[in-house]
Regions:
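Conserved catalytic-site region of short-chain dehydrogenase/reductase
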Residues: 47, 84-94, 139-145
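A conserved pocket-lining segment of Rossmann-fold NAD(P)-dependent short-chain dehydrogenase/reductase
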Residues: 103-106, 152-173, 177
């Protein structure tokens, strides 16, 4: 963890914690000393950033430097946490998998671009060291102390702060299943291979309805068309560039919503023994 990070999720493990910052390669050797395995889970996960170069420095340069440092330190195997954001999408909305064709148009926004470029660099590294790649979808569940953008959406919906939705879809995974998938990749995964750690495909309206049901609120019923929102999103982004405050929506977020991010976990199930639970459980645990 970084020295500046919120470490509430490490309660009870403080004596085992080591400190590392992807933007500070000089912190790597001490953190990797006597380390047999590395699970590189960290990333700059934001849907909007005022400075894309800073995100790329962490997600790409920092990741490659860390994996090279792990090799130098004698680490036997590394697990690199990529994202489904780095994968291709289908034109018809059917579930994509690890072999789906990747097109530049799929990588909308700084985060997706950085994760795609990082994964490609990691795949090249995997030709010379033992690295397994995992691609989590949308983890939801307990312990999201920051919270992540997805966790914030669930909290906002539970508080009645999302009266409307756009017509899009996503794959929801319980965060504990994603964690278990990392350990399965460590013991069962093939070096150089990638594995989607997903869960259940849901339309956004159905996810919000599930959050509403479990939190005792009415589900949002207003569906907003994407095209009329684009000028508003553009204006919000211009304001954010001046203030530095994260906008409610951006043109890139709306462009991403045009594609359903549905994914198959068949490869992880068959090769790793991955067994995700229903989205209902993930949402219920996120609301505890």
């Amino acid at each position: 963890a970084r020295q500046s990070s919120d470490r509430r999720h490490l309660a009870g493990f403080e004596d085992q914690a080591v400190y590392l910052d992807l933007a500070e390669p000089e912190s790597f050797p001490a953190a990797l000393k006597d380390c047999r395995y590395l699970l590189h889970v960290a990333a700059d996960y934001r849907l909007w950033v005022p400075n894309e170069a800073a995100m790329r420095k962490v997600n790409i340069d920092g990741s490659i430097a860390l994996l090279r440092a792990a090799q130098h330190a004698g680490v036997e195997r590394s697990i690199y946490t990529s994202s489904v954001a780095a994968l291709g999408l289908t034109d018809d909305g059917s579930p994509a998998d690890e072999t789906t064709l990747i097109l530049p148009a799929h990588h909308v926004g700084a985060y997706k671009r950085s994760k795609y470029d990082a994964e490609q660099a990691v795949r090249r590294l995997a030709q010379e060291q033992d690295i397994v790649i995992v691609n989590p979808s949308t983890p939801i569940g307990p312990g999201d102390v920051k919270p992540t953008p997805t966790g914030q959406m669930v909290l906002d919906a539970a508080r009645g702060k999302m009266p409307a939705f756009v017509d899009t879809g996503l794959n929801v995974a319980h965060v504990d299943d994603v964690a278990a998938g990392h350990l399965l990749a460590l013991t069962q995964g093939r070096s150089g291979e990638g594995y989607i750690l997903g869960g259940e495909d849901l339309m956004l309206r159905d996810l919000l309805a599930l959050v509403a049901e479990l939190s005792g609120r009415a589900a949002p019923k207003l569906r907003l068309p994407l095209a009329p929102l684009m000028p508003l999103a553009w204006a919000m982004e211009r304001i954010a560039e001046r203030t530095g405050k994260t906008p409610l929506m951006t043109p890139d977020i709306l462009r991403m919503a045009k594609k359903k991010m549905f994914f198959s976990t068949h490869k992880a199930r068959t090769e790793l023994g991955y067994a995700p639970r229903p989205a209902r459980q993930a949402v219920a645990d996120a609301l505890i």
